[in-house]
Amino acid sequence: ASTSDPIEGYWTYLDRANDPSYARPGGRYTLALVSDGAGGYDILYVDGAQTLADRWKPLMLKGRLRPGIFENHYSLEWIDAEFEPVTEDIHADISQGAILTLSFPLLKTTLRFSKMPVRH
């Protein structure tokens, strides 16, 4: 389906910065962001799980972005690779309309995703 919302669409793993003694990313994910109709977005899993890869299925809920007071800054709810929710002290930013940064400061981890071009 076509959308005029520049945030909606597919986002693919770009890179990460993390301390593996605090956290290990569960894969090189492809995600879909879909508007929730209230200024936020549902984050849906598409592909790329490495941890418990057989249990992750396309379109499963991977997280949510909730709007904050700053433009392009969101509070983040995340479902980790083992299906555990992470909801405190985490946030997300979208820069240049093309880079989604998920920040987990207490886990010394940042994951970045790039917006995939829309195919017509």
Task: For every predicted segment, state its role.
Residues T110-H120:
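Short, low-complexity, Pro/Ser/Thr/Gly-rich segments in the mature regions of secreted, periplasmic
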Residues I94-A98:
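Residue-level recognition of beta-strand termini and adjacent short loop/turns
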Residues D5-H91, S103-P105, S114-M116:
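Central antiparallel beta-sheet cores of small beta-barrel/beta-sandwich binding domains
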Residues L100, K108-T109:
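Intrinsically disordered/low-complexity terminal segments and short unstructured peptides
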